[in-house]
């Protein structure tokens, strides 16, 4: 019998409310998550992530969510999870400082290559090279000053390949015309300070911010800087849109606190068991998108790009506390051509990426013969990927549309070991933890595709979709081996997905409902011998709901909820498990979570005041594959308010955890004990924005 955590949060009433609202709605057109319900309904929402060009969001035969610029400005995110709380099916688990782990139609995935399950991108280009992802890579994106954040859920479209397994997060830089001329100063609890500014001139816009935070736990905190330069220009018959973005993070990291429900102890919450921990990360990337009309109804686009990333951090979560430095540099090109006849649209493209990366791990102090001091790993990898894709959409009738697409992709790795082959330990070690495989070359050939059928009326879209996604192994899964594993004989992970969805608008109500089933095969995992192997199977089923309701000219309500089951679908000898785990919930996969925002805007009543009360919840979840240890879940209340002191000056307040709940942002069970990244107590940030 499968053990299941009992329901602990009063979410049932919230889901019931949303369900009743949907049940009483007359079907209509598409919704946008966040507060799009407050926007002018005459302005049609578009999504660019699905095809690399603007598509009417209402008609897309795939599940999506978007958080627009006005939402981002009101949220004023200090961390990425404050944005993705508003996306149905998404939970970004907050670590310490700016660290995070992503859940998108999935559990919160951990491990060397877990980040490969998600595509995180800026303007459609992966923040990091697909074979060199990092679980914390969202901290590279300039979310505060983005023009929009778009999320596609599940294996979505063929313009994305490796890593677009569970979904795509695409952060769009604001167009020059969209960039606000303003300066913003913020100050808050525990020495939080942020200065941000943005402005545009002619065809160029610049946005920049700098943040300093003193930290809640002892000897923690961070300094971070981000900047985005945007170009929009026309040259002869070409339209040119480009961006240059960089970020720098200097973080003093607080480690897990230990002990069952220690996050409820006020003294324990402030402790930092790892005052020596740190993370320094630097990133920069740029692209130019050249596009021009082709044969009247078509378009040609060429988008060359480059990226550079470097990060050094202490592995405080491991007892021997090694230090890792990883970096990579890339150049690439996205090329696409599209056209349209009366009933048939098509596009075809090619993507090329070349990356040179490296990883160096060393340990300062001797821990044991099996975890010695000195160099553990030192290697370089040259990676090349080449992909071609095509997609067609056929308007069968005025209301029925059929979509189909396919993508083939090859990934090649040329690995060079720069230190001694074999174990990093002395010959007398009984079970050396670190093994350096000999230099080698690997290649992977994969494909992805989708079929969709959709029905459209003036105010409703219904769709059914089948899709396949994949991810090639990450370089760390192949070349950072342990416990005597001489070679990682692993293959690409694949996922097959079926999805049904309906979205619409009825008067003041918007809604979006999607149900999905996904089966993953050849899942890469670490077995009980600490070998990286393929062959696991997992199943993912869920229901997602997003709602927006304009109650009257002042009050509005938005909300999202997700109910899902993520389980092991094969009997594997997973590290940390005992006996059989087939049928168990995958650890760190709450059955339900979501958020509701109640908003008031008194501008129509002649009062320059707006406010938002937010309730968010995460249900309890298991911490281990045997489903023996669990976290109880939590609920939080947050408040945001803005007061226009004058036409050019606005005072803002962001207050989080209003009830001062003791909770964990992330819970874990490892090395024989409960471990928690502690949630912060009640906090407040005051801001002053000057429009120029």
Where is each model-derived feature located?
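Surface-exposed extracellular loop regions of Gram-negative outer-membrane beta-barrel proteins
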Residues: 257, 261-264, 356-370, 412-433, ...
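Membrane-embedded beta-barrel scaffold of Gram-negative outer-membrane proteins
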Residues: 196-197, 202, 299-315, 454-469, ...
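Gram-negative outer-membrane beta-barrel transporters
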Residues: 340, 395-402, 410, 510-520, ...
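Transmembrane beta-barrel wall of Gram-negative outer-membrane proteins
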Residues: 187-212, 217-254, 276-299, 340, ...
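C-terminal beta-signal and adjacent terminal beta-strands/loops
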Residues: 616-624, 642-692
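Short strand-turn segments of transmembrane beta-barrel domains in outer membranes
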Residues: 117-118, 155-157, 168-199, 207-208, ...
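Extracytoplasmic beta-strand/coil segments of soluble accessory domains associated
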Residues: 81-125
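Short acidic/polar hinge/loop motifs at secondary-structure boundaries
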Residues: 125-153, 172, 489
